[in-house]
């Protein structure tokens, strides 16, 4: 685990949703098949990056995670800004640091911590090598925007996680299975089984992750 200089503010989330269930909405192709299921209304709802393309989901979110391509895709930037300004009830968190450096210095196009704060978001730090079960002391593994919220909500005490639109790729809305991403999913499974053996993970309409967790078909 890699110590973080920037994640101490995440301490407020320790066991914040202890014993509750959550849905993570990613934007792989199967997001288009999603429909609410029994018990979904009571779940904590987390949306990722381009989930704004699905307003019926966005308007019910409790958390929104974003960061990449903020300065390289103006339409994307404007839609992030809109979520942060028009949905004050959504707690937004931004991937704004990586391995001890601000994304202003890194220059890859991710949002800077200063801009994240202007939008009312919580900037946090990722790394490229290890997951953590103490997100306020150590940086979370990045590589994909799906991994930080997984580490965050386990830290929050969530005991059941539904994965929607987590199809094993980096490209929103189209099939784009990535072996790199699947490698980190495998690492996540090992991390989760070691540090959080009790919480249950359920893949809704799984594709690349079929058989990795509990599978469920919801249409």
Where are these regions (language model features)?
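Metal-ion/cofactor- or nucleotide/acyl-coenzyme-handling active-site neighborhoods
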Residues: 1-219
């Amino acid at each position: 685990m890699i110590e973080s200089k920037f994640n101490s503010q995440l301490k407020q989330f320790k066991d914040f949703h202890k014993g509750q269930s959550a849905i993570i909405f990613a934007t792989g192709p199967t997001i288009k098949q999603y429909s609410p299921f029994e018990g979904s209304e009571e779940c904590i709802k987390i949306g990722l990056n381009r989930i704004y393309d699905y307003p019926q989901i966005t308007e019910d979110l409790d958390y929104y995670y974003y960061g990449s391509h903020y300065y390289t895709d103006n339409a994307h930037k404007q839609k992030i800004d809109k979520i942060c300004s028009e949905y004050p009830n959504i707690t937004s968190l931004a991937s704004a640091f990586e391995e001890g450096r601000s994304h202003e210095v890194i220059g890859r196009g991710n949002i800077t911590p200063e801009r994240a704060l202007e939008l009312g978001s919580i900037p946090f730090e990722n790394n490229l090598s290890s997951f953590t079960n103490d997100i306020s002391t150590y940086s979370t593994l990045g590589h994909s925007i799906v991994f930080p919220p997984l580490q965050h909500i386990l830290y929050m005490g969530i005991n059941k996680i539904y994965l929607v639109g987590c199809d094993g790729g980096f490209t929103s809305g189209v099939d784009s299975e990535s072996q790199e991403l699947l490698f980190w999913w495998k690492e996540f499974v090992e991390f989760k089984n070691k540090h959080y053996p009790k919480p249950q993970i359920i893949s809704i309409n799984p594709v690349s992750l079929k058989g990795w967790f509990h599978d469920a078909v919801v249409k």
